[in-house]
Amino acid sequence: FDCNPSEFSARIAANSSIVPLMNQDLIRPLDDLVKKYGKGIQDSQLITIDGKVMAVAFMANTQHLYYREDVLKDLGIAIPKTYEEVVAASEKIRASGKMQYPYAAAYKAGWNLAEEFVNMFIGHGGEFFKSGSAEPNINNAKGVATLNMLKKLSELSNPDYLTHDSEAIKVEWESGNVALMTLWASRSGTLLDDEGDPNITKATKLTGPATVGGGNIPAATLWWDGFTLAKNRPDADAEATFRALAHAASNKKMVADAADQAVWLVEGFVPGPKSIGVIEAVKMGAKPYPMLPQMGLMHGALGSEIVEFLQGKESAEQALKDVEAAYISKAKEQGFL
């Protein structure tokens, strides 16, 4: 995609990946094509940055809670609404002897782990950067509270949690090892399909994302997935590609046929039971993942620098100091600071 000419005419992007594509000047504005060929596309699908349409979104996503209804009922545990309640519920499940590691989330070192920090920090009301600048702003009480909650949850998870991505925790769930889990909404389809233990499938329920630290917005971020078009391709290619993808991204038949595969942003979508996590997140006022040019550098620093804290090798304050130092070095290199 970053060759000239580009090998591909389109690329699927999301909140986190569109900004680097723009920074490298790899994608083109779509305003003219939207005017010409976008009649089926809703305004809410148009991702506008600095006044220009840079992507057309077709689905929404977030991470939210999944729970085993049978396990919670057996132990008289209410459906958790906060991460503090998730911890208490997990401790009760462990004490009952039903499960040794009742909680799971994608804590794989790197991108996944950083995403868990991002969610929890936003839930605590954190702002990643000092107002109006690219100066980091995580080495504070909210950052420490975020790390402490991640540590509590990790202690209730499989000891190999630092290797567990979304696929690995899905396997843990389907094996009956886990009763509470934070996972992407887009994964619900495979958890609720006919494969695997029918008793576990039947007892698998979805609810909104949890809040944390007395906050009133979810400790979660809203995401969109959409298509962008390569700048380094002929205009005729861009036009043909846009027409094909705009047809797909406004296709009511597709949305009806695949209604339970995703939370579609396409007109005519009727949310089903698998959409509950995203719908609840929106109702609760979840914030979108930050579309800031320097956010990728912060995300990268978090994914590598908080591991030692979770392993008990350094303090929360030291870990946050390390994150800021790693971020500052990269941000200076790339001219953000």
Where are these regions (language model features)?
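A structural signal for short loop-to-beta-strand junctions that line the ligand-binding cleft
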Residues: F1-D2, S6-S9, D31-V71, Y101, ...
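Early extracytoplasmic/lumenal segment of secretory-pathway proteins
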Residues: F1-I18, Q318
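Hinge/lid segment of periplasmic solute-binding proteins
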Residues: I12-T62, A78, V87, L113-E116, ...
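Short, solvent-exposed loop/beta-turn-alpha elements that line the ligand-binding surface or hinge
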Residues: R28-Q42, P102-K108, H124-A145, D193-T204, ...
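Extracytoplasmic/periplasmic solute-binding protein
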Residues: I49-D50, M54-F58, Q63, V87-E135, ...
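Short helix-initiation/N-cap motifs at beta->coil->alpha
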Residues: Y83-A88, Y161-S175
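Glycine-centered hinge/linker elements that transmit conformational signals in sensory
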Residues: A89-E91, G132-L162
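C-terminal lobe and pocket-closing loops
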Residues: S186-T201, V212-S304, Q334-F336
